[in-house]
């Protein structure tokens, strides 16, 4: 992943305003739109130490996450008093396993993740600059089984009015990134977003948080 030091430094300095202390209400509200089955495997790219992992592990037998920062993954297990089995896979990746959870540390693009049925992306696509997003979408679709589904949370604003991350990923780009898939927007909220402070949003001409259901063809 390009510029990994940016994210390593964020975690090292505990500058994690992107981290939610609770389960994302959009996950709770819209996960059922994927018609998920407990036996279906889930992937959470760039998972951080998200509480969403716990919620998903209560719904599914296998939840995989990939996170660049070891600090984030170790904090996740420590804060929940979990003691994972840790395996050094290679020079770039470690594997942390505990019950339904399997978390990889290291580069998402090279992590040895198993194929999955479902993907949950709240903070991955919007964390990547435009030049990396096509490669990311290609990697996600490579890992997604035929007929697999993605729940994607995105943001749409005028990029020149605010330097990301989180970056703006407008509808046209999402449809291009996932061309060949069925892409549906199931939610759009143009009110104040909790991830951006009010002063920041006051300088934006428009802002929307959106939720998408994306289905890969059989």
From Swiss-Prot:
Q: Which UniProt keywords apply?
A: Cytoplasm, Methyltransferase, S-adenosyl-L-methionine, Transferase
Q: Which GO terms describe its cellular component?
A: cytoplasm
Residue stretches in coiled coil: none
UniProt cross-references to InterPro entries, sorted A to Z:
SAM-dependent_MTases_sf (IPR029063), Thiopur_S-MeTfrase_Se/Te_detox (IPR022474), Thiopurine_S-MeTrfase (IPR025835), TPMT (IPR008854)
GO molecular function per UniProt: thiopurine S-methyltransferase activity
The UniProt catalytic activity note for this protein reads:
S-adenosyl-L-methionine + a thiopurine = S-adenosyl-L-homocysteine + a thiopurine S-methylether
Main location, first listed in the record: cytoplasm
Please give the CDD domains that the UniProt record associates with this protein. AdoMet_MTases (cd02440)
Give the top-level enzyme category: transferase
* Highest taxon listed in the record's lineage: Bacteria
Q: Where does S-adenosyl-L-methionine bind?
A: 11, 46, 67, 122
UniProt-recorded name of the protein = Thiopurine S-methyltransferase
What is the species listed in this Swiss-Prot or TrEMBL entry?
Vibrio cholerae serotype O1 (strain ATCC 39315 / El Tor Inaba N16961)
């Amino acid at each position: 992943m390009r510029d990994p030091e940016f994210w390593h430094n964020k975690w090292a300095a505990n500058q994690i305003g992107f981290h939610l202390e609770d389960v994302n209400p959009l996950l709770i509200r819209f996960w059922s739109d994927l018609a998920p089955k407990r036996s279906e495997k889930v992937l959470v790219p760039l998972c951080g130490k998200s509480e969403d992992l716990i919620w998903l592990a209560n719904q599914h037998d296998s939840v995989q996450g990939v996170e660049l920062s070891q600090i984030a993954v170790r904090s996740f297990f420590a804060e929940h008093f979990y003691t994972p089995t840790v395996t050094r896979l290679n020079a770039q990746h470690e594997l942390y396993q505990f019950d339904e959870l399997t978390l990889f540390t290291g580069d998402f693009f090279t992590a040895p993740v198993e194929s999955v049925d479902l993907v949950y992306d709240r903070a991955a696509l919007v964390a990547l600059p435009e030049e990396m997003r096509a490669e990311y979408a290609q990697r996600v679709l490579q890992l997604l089984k035929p007929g697999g589904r993605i729940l994607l949370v995105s943001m749409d604003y005028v990029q020149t009015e605010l330097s990301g991350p989180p970056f703006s990923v407008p509808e046209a780009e999402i449809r291009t990134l996932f061309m060949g898939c069925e892409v549906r927007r199931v939610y759009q909220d143009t009110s104040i977003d909790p991830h951006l402070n009010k002063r920041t949003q006051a300088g934006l001409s428009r802002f929307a948080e959106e939720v998408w259901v994306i289905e890969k063809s059989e």
